[in-house]
């Protein structure tokens, strides 16, 4: 009886002029699978993820063209600073964008984020020197603060039974963007050299050899911006009064202890929310590893065999990463949701991290192969690493968004984005320095060459796995 009365209260307290209430009504009346909403969330996240790592397959050659590195072994050092500038910019603005999303809505932040890709990613492709590349990447990161708000949006636009799938779509699009982005960079960079029959050296793509992949992503971002202008706003623009259904439902609760928890959570700040903070810390460790791995993989694949690399071209790297993205898409859309329901997000994260360490341990051995054996092995390892890494991140997405109320999700995701961006800014810079150092110690007695690089990656990953255990990682009961 109480449940029926609660439903009536909820039905009567929709606000006619509130965009969030309209979305809630739409969710109640909707029947069937929300294909369009899933598609829009997916392409928005993909749009913001593509430029993050699209530069890595050609960054080695871009730094070489800038003539800033005195020796070949120093290219990785300078590449790390260009790679980290995006995340450094995002670290400075993520909390601000989260607060804007909670105050003015998710949609404005999403539109600004997609539009920033159109402008600054295009300018990056036209970079004339090292500092222009750093500044345009920094600006791109500063204005691209939509990942936190889009996670909140994904929780709010879907019914409860589809929220797990929604966050899986976010992490899938994010993971695929981080993989397909480099594939685009690999296939389209230096087009006058790779496809001389289509592009001449005298064309704009010959004068700016890294402009085409940036332009392709910017065109996609422009189309996504148009689509994003049609999405509904999910943030409620009214305040609850004492006679609103929220308080009525609170009085109807059969569990007085849950009321105390709700009051306590409402009064406490986000920084005192340990389930949120602990999941953010673990998320940061995995993010640092993920970004460092993304840069190291491309540098390792591009570097000469005499330094323990694969000697791959940008197109070769693009092929490997394209297969990785396809494998990740199949797994996330077909198997991840079952694994998450069966094991829970924490166990999925823990198992994924542990298996990823095994895969990474094989990378130095892969460099000893050649021909078809090398191609098959490195592609399989890349697919496995991508699936495991994205599965771990998805579990942490779910934990973060379940740890807070709707009106706190933008700020909570902003905090997560700031912390994650700082760690991801450290990742490429540290990875570039360590990779450059490893190339100079080929004859070392302990973990020579790239063996040291992958060992350090595994140490970071092991730390993330350890932090998923109690008492450190707490799971909310909401």
UniProtKB/Swiss-Prot annotation:
GO molecular function: solute:potassium antiporter activity
Protein keywords: Cell membrane, Membrane, Transmembrane, Transmembrane helix, Transport, Vacuole
One BP annotation, GO: response to water deprivation
SUPFAM superfamilies, per the entry: MFS general substrate transporter
Database matches in InterPro entries: MFS, MFS_dom, MFS_trans_sf, Tet-R_TetA/multi-R_MdtG-like
GO cellular component: plant-type vacuole membrane; plasma membrane
TM ranges: 43-63, 81-101, 108-128, 130-150, 169-189, 208-228, 280-300, 317-337, 346-367, 378-398, 415-435, 453-473
Recorded phenotype for the gene knockout or disruption: No visible phenotype when grown under normal conditions. No visible phenotype when grown in presence of zinc. Hypersensitivity to drought stress and auxin-related defects.
Tissue expr: Predominantly expressed in roots and stomatal guard cells. Detected in anther stamen filaments and shoot apical meristem. In the mature portion of roots, restricted to the cortex. At the root tip, highly expressed in both the cortical and epidermal cell layers of the apical meristem and the transition zone, while absent from the quiescent center or the columella cells. Not detected in lateral root primordia.
Induction remark: By 2,4-D treatment.
Major place of residence: membrane
Signal peptide location: none
Topological category with respect to the lipid bilayer: Multi-pass membrane protein
Pfam families: MFS_1
Compartment annotation: Cell membrane
Similarity comment: Belongs to the major facilitator superfamily.
Miscellaneous comment in the UniProt entry for this protein: Heterologous expression of ZIFL1 in yeast leads to increased resistance to 2,4-dichlorophenoxyacetic acid (2,4-D), indole-3-acetic acid (IAA), aluminum and thallium. Not involved in zinc stress resistance.
Its biological purpose: Major facilitator superfamily (MFS) transporter probably involved in 2,4-dichlorophenoxyacetic acid (2,4-D) export. K(+) may be the physiological substrate of the transporter.
Protein name as catalogued: Protein ZINC INDUCED FACILITATOR-LIKE 1
Organism: Arabidopsis thaliana (Mouse-ear cress)
Gene: ZIFL1
């Amino acid at each position: 009886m109480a449940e029926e009365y609660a439903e009536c209260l909820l039905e009567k307290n929709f606000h006619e002029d509130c965009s969030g209430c309209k979305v809630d009504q739409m969710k109640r009346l909707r029947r069937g699978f929300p294909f369009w909403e899933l598609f829009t969330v997916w392409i928005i996240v993909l749009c913001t993820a593509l430029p993050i790592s699209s530069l890595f397959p050609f960054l080695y050659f871009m730094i070489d063209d800038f003539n800033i590195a005195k020796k070949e072994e120093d290219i990785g050092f300078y590449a790390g600073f260009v790679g980290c500038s995006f995340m450094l910019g995002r670290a400075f603005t993520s909390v601000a964008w989260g607060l804007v999303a909670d105050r003015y809505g998710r949609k404005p932040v999403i539109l600004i984020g997609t539009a920033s890709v159109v402008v600054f990613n295009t300018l990056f492709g036209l970079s004339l020197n090292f500092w222009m590349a750093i500044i345009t990447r920094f600006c791109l990161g500063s204005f691209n603060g939509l990942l936190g708000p889009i996670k909140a949006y994904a929780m709010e636009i879907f019914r409860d039974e589809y929220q797990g799938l929604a966050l899986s779509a976010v992490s899938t699009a994010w993971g695929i963007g981080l993989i397909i982005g480099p594939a685009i960079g690999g296939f389209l960079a230096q087009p006058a050299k790779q496809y001389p029959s289509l592009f001449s050296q005298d064309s704009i793509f010959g004068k700016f050899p890294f402009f085409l992949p940036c332009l392709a992503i910017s065109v996609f971002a422009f189309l996504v911006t148009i689509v994003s202008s049609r999405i509904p706003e999910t943030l409620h623009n009214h305040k609850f009064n004492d006679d609103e259904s929220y308080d009525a439902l609170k009085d109807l609760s059969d569990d007085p202890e849950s009321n105390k928890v709700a009051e306590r959570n409402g009064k406490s700040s986000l920084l005192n929310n340990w389930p949120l903070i602990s999941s953010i810390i673990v998320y940061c460790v995995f993010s640092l590893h993920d970004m460092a791995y993304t840069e190291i993989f491309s540098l390792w694949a591009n570097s000469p065999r005499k330094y323990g690399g694969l000697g791959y071209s940008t197109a070769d790297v693009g092929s490997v990463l394209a297969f990785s993205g396809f494998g990740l898409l199949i797994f996330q859309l077909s198997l991840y949701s079952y694994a998450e329901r069966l094991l829970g997000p924490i166990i999925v994260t823990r198992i994924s991290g542990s298996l990823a360490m095994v895969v990474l341990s094989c990378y130095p051995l892969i460099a000893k192969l050649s021909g078809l054996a090398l191609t098959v092995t490195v592609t399989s390892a890349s697919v496995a690493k991508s699936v495991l890494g994205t599965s771990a991140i998805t579990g942490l997405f779910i934990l973060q968004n379940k740890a807070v109320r709707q009106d706190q999700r933008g700020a909570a995701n902003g905090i997560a984005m700031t912390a994650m961006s700082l760690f991801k800014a450290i990742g490429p810079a540290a990875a570039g320095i360590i990779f450059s150092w490893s190339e100079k110690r080929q004859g070392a007695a302990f973990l020579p060459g790239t063996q040291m690089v992958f060992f350090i990656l595994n140490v970071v990953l092991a730390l993330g796995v350890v932090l998923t255990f109690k008492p450190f990682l707490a799971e909310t009961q909401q």
